[in-house]
Amino acid sequence: MKKLNADDYIDILNDVLKDICPTDSEKEELKIFSDKIISKIKDISKYPVLDIIQVGSTARDANLKNDHDIDIFLRFEKETDRDMLKELGLKLGKDVINYFNGKSWIEYAEHPYVSGEIGKFNLDIVPCYDIENCEKIISAVDRTPLHNEFLLNAYENNDLSNDIRLLKKFLKGLGIYGSDLKTAGFSGYLCELLILKYRGFLNLLSAVQTWKPKHSIVLDEIYEMYDLKKDHDFLKFNDSLVVYDPVDLNRNVAAALNKENLCKFIFYSKMFLKKPSKEFFYGFYKKTTDLLNQRKRGYLITLEILRPENIVEDVIYPQMEKIQKSINKLVKEHDFEYLQYQNFADDNTCYLSWEFLIHELPDVKLRIGPPVYSEQGVLNFITHNEHYFVKECNVCAYKTRKYKNIQILFEDIVNGKLKNIITYPKYVCPENAKIRLGTFIERK
């Protein structure tokens, strides 16, 4: 691709930046309040907390306007008992939020941590262990302070804050920002590493033009940090995009990104560079989806399944995907073609939706067997099929369909008649689900 002329994009990007950059007063207010939180934790802490660190985008001036999230990590010595780490982390978190008359609750990752609201500020107070780069983690969040330290050092000679904001807003517009298992997109940390690698938003979009699935990225800083040669043999990953974590070379930062979302990023990056527009940054995915859905629809079916209590999205979405793919395999085996499928969960219900190209089939189907010269294959075929005949060069037979209407197949699913064929995950069971015809629930 020819070299970009930044002047072709500068007006659009500046307009977007006016919308998404926090004001100086907003930044100052956030810093003052964060310092108060950290100071208070130090005051009330009578426990072996080695360090109290603010991490995340607000700590690195990489947040969007009106993002008032404050992430505080409490680092404990590696010898600290897990139960004690959990107990002390929860107590400190609750105590400091209560001191500021806030509202607190417990969230769950590998171990529980405290989240809360104090006015317009959202807080996460998370205990972790003090580890070094490439040291084996003890808990899943132990790398986060190291990520923060690496990025702050990298930004000392690189002012990339606005480029990071542009990338985040661009990905939000495309509906692919977020590394949760529901979104399967780009995490904030991944965004920062990509901007650091290519030294700018437009440079990144230009580089993306040559990407294909399985593309691999190693930051220049990694070679310097670990004194590695350029031909170093890194661990191989089988993911859509591979971005090596500077603080743990055995980890792929882009592991959560699925193939479709990577390809959306590649495609719409090309579209933006060819025909730049602010539209890409503002609900572009939703507008595009709404336009596509104005067409005449196929045959729509949704299964409504009761969602178990206290099962988080990072558990429920992979299980919905698993059961839906198992059902997809079954409907294909019975010759029903679908145009699309989606899943979505609200607080009470899991929705599995399909749009079928055809919902009713003839009573009979043609079963094509082996070529007539395949002696053993033909013998097996005629043993299991009556009324066989030759069509072109294959022995064939007509079979009566078990399901000629897709609705009947789904009724057997919810009545439990196909439970030996479909793979049931633990928390999403289609038995006794409600079938809604003519309805397709979009993921929100």
Swiss-Prot record:
Reaction catalyzed: a tRNA precursor + 2 CTP + ATP = a tRNA with a 3' CCA end + 3 diphosphate; a tRNA with a 3' CCA end + 2 CTP + ATP = a tRNA with a 3' CCACCA end + 3 diphosphate
Residue positions binding Mg(2+): D69, D71, D124
Enzyme class: transferase
Stretches of the chain forming a coiled coil according to its record: none
GO biological process: RNA repair; tRNA 3'-terminal CCA addition
Pfam families: CAA_C, NTP_transf_2, tRNA_NucTransf2
Record GO terms (molecular function): ATP binding; CCA tRNA nucleotidyltransferase activity; magnesium ion binding; tRNA binding
E.C. numbers: 2.7.7.72
UniProt keyword terms in alphabetical order: ATP-binding, Magnesium, Metal-binding, Nucleotide-binding, Nucleotidyltransferase, RNA repair, RNA-binding, Transferase, tRNA processing
Binding site residues for CTP: S57, R60, H147, K168, Y177
Cofactor: Mg(2+)
Annotated positions binding ATP: S57, R60, H147, K168, Y177
InterPro entries according to UniProt: CAA_C, CCA-adding_arc, CCA_tRNA_nucleotrans_2, NT_2-5OAS_ClassI-CCAase, NT_sf, NuclTrfase_I-like_C, Polymerase_NTP_transf_dom, tRNA_NucTransf2
Listed CDD domains: NT_2-5OAS_ClassI-CCAase (cd05400)
Other information: A single active site specifically recognizes both ATP and CTP and is responsible for their addition.
Function: Catalyzes the addition and repair of the essential 3'-terminal CCA sequence in tRNAs without using a nucleic acid template. Adds these three nucleotides in the order of C, C, and A to the tRNA nucleotide-73, using CTP and ATP as substrates and producing inorganic pyrophosphate. tRNA 3'-terminal CCA addition is required both for tRNA processing and repair. Also involved in tRNA surveillance by mediating tandem CCA addition to generate a CCACCA at the 3' terminus of unstable tRNAs. While stable tRNAs receive only 3'-terminal CCA, unstable tRNAs are marked with CCACCA and rapidly degraded.
Family, as annotated: Belongs to the tRNA nucleotidyltransferase/poly(A) polymerase family. Archaeal CCA-adding enzyme subfamily.
Subunit field text: Homodimer.
Designated name of the protein: CCA-adding enzyme
Taxonomic source organism: Methanococcus maripaludis (strain DSM 14266 / JCM 13030 / NBRC 101832 / S2 / LL)
